Amino acid sequence: MTSVLMIDNCDSFTYNLVDQFSPHGTIVIVKRNHPFYDGEIEAIMALTSICITPGPCYPAEAALNSCSIIGHLAGRIPILGICLGQQALGQARGGLVIFAHGKLSNIEHNGIFAPLFNPPRALPAGRYHSLVVEPARIEVTGQCNQLEVVPQEIMAIRHRDLPVEGVQFHPESILSSNGAAILANLIHRPCH
């Protein structure tokens, strides 16, 4: 049985994500982004993975505890960050968070979404963010290929050595094709 800790950054999309994980027989535990106690952090290690949800504001304001969890557990358990969650992953790994604008866009990727399905190289996806990550010690695995976006905004990142990944767009959105399969990748990804 797989289990996901959903760190809720007080976003209306959180339970859309829960619904996306549920058909896979996954137990989803939702916990608000409040300080975690030492015993809770050890209990998280028994879970299959962590998903850090979208939310408002900058990661330093809204996702501070998510950044702490990333620092404690990166490399010990697979972590997926979505929107604000990706920004928290980027910030925790030395990236900058800068302003952007949300819309429907084609996301070009390097095959990151291919293990469970064969997506088109330009994947239509719903973007609801106003901030994006600038890379530091992370690998860029997807970018927005819209002509009006210059330079291309980062839409997917991966830590170079750890099972820590993030997407800026919302895979649970009805605008995003193959979103359920993208989320399923997290469930089936081992921690190396």
Swiss-Prot record:
EC class: transferase
Alphabetically ordered keywords of this record: Folate biosynthesis, Glutamine amidotransferase, Transferase
Pfam families on file: GATase
Active site: C83, H170, E172
PANTHER family per record: MULTIFUNCTIONAL TRYPTOPHAN BIOSYNTHESIS PROTEIN (PTHR43418:SF4), MULTIFUNCTIONAL TRYPTOPHAN BIOSYNTHESIS PROTEIN-RELATED (PTHR43418)
Superkingdom classification of source: Bacteria
Metabolic or biological pathway, per its Swiss-Prot or TrEMBL entry: Cofactor biosynthesis; tetrahydrofolate biosynthesis; 4-aminobenzoate from chorismate: step 1/2
Protein name per Swiss-Prot or TrEMBL: Aminodeoxychorismate synthase component 2
Family annotation (Gene3D superfamilies): 3.40.50.880
